[in-house]
A protein has these predicted regions:
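Juxtamembrane helix-loop transition segments at the membrane interface in multi-pass membrane proteins
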Residues: 1-5, 9, 61-78, 225-232
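Long hydrophobic segments that form regular secondary structure
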Residues: 35, 62-71, 81-129, 147
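Hydrophobic alpha-helical transmembrane segments in multi-pass membrane proteins
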Residues: 13, 17-18, 22, 103-116, ...
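Alpha-helical transmembrane segments of multi-pass inner-membrane proteins
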Residues: 4, 9, 37-49, 53, ...
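Transmembrane helix-loop junctions at the membrane interface of multipass transporters and ion channels
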Residues: 11, 15-43, 227-232
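Juxtamembrane inter-helical linkers in multi-pass membrane proteins
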Residues: 67-92, 139, 182-194
Length: 232
């Protein structure tokens, strides 16, 4: 039961997937309303889909040999509840903040640098160097080679595929990769809409955008989650 829970719990959207849900939700609603500001309404829907995916996956896995058998009894002894001290609260806050800073300063930063390099350099006329057209970049070559695999899902665009691939290292890097590929500069509040407008051109319809969102919701978790699952 513990292994089953570990494997299926990843279908529930984590905090790292919320920016992707907000971005793609805005893209999807723009097809119907013309506005990119209603994307937050997709979050409850994605959580509901995640819960359904957990139930379906658990039922299917329970019928397989590695997870079959009688459920093990679960006993948890809870200590008495106490009001936490300020020191304890601050220590827990610092641990979470430190973990995020380390993740943002290592995995996310390196992922953005790698995506920037791959999208800014490539081979033109037989020589390697900086490219003005992202379509001639190394990332376009890699994404274009893999894109046909994702074409049946509705997003055979190399930029969408590249953004999805970056999510395997950290889900937070999906939106940042979209920003890099969209060549966004300027005010951040305006950039959010500009990125969404650029991303919309990657998908032929709202269904394709939903397919992209659903794929990144239910695909393999990030490296940090996989390493934690292995330890458990």
């Amino acid at each position: 039961d513990r292994r089953l829970t570990i494997l299926t719990a990843t279908f529930i959207p984590c905090g790292a997937k919320l920016p992707v849900i907000a971005m793609m939700g805005g893209v999807m609603t723009s097809y119907a309303t013309g506005s990119y500001e209603a994307g937050g309404l997709m979050a409850p829907c994605m959580y509901f889909i995640g819960i359904v995916a957990v139930l379906v996956a658990a039922i299917i896995l329970k019928k397989t040999k590695p997870f079959s058998g009688k459920p093990a009894p679960f006993v948890m002894e809870l200590p008495q509840y106490h009001i936490p001290s300020a020191k304890t609260v601050l220590l827990h806050v610092w641990e979470r903040l430190k973990g995020f800073i380390i993740k943002a300063g290592t995995i996310l930063f390196l992922a953005c640098v790698v995506m920037w390099f791959l999208s800014g350099y490539g081979f033109v006329n037989g020589s390697f160097g900086a490219v003005e057209d992202p379509g001639n970049s190394l990332l376009a070559v890699i994404g274009g080679a893999i894109a046909p695999i994702f074409a049946p899902l509705g997003f055979g665009n190399w930029k969408a595929v590249a953004a999805s691939l970056s999510g395997f290292s950290a889900k937070e890097s999906i939106v940042s990769t979209m920003g890099v590929l969209a060549n966004i500069t300027g005010d951040a509040s305006e950039d959010a809409v500009t990125v969404a407008e650029a991303v919309r051109t990657w998908f032929p319809s709202a269904v394709a955008a939903f397919s992209f969102l659903l794929f990144n919701l239910l695909d393999s978790p990030c490296l940090a989650a996989i390493s934690t699952m292995a330890k458990e």
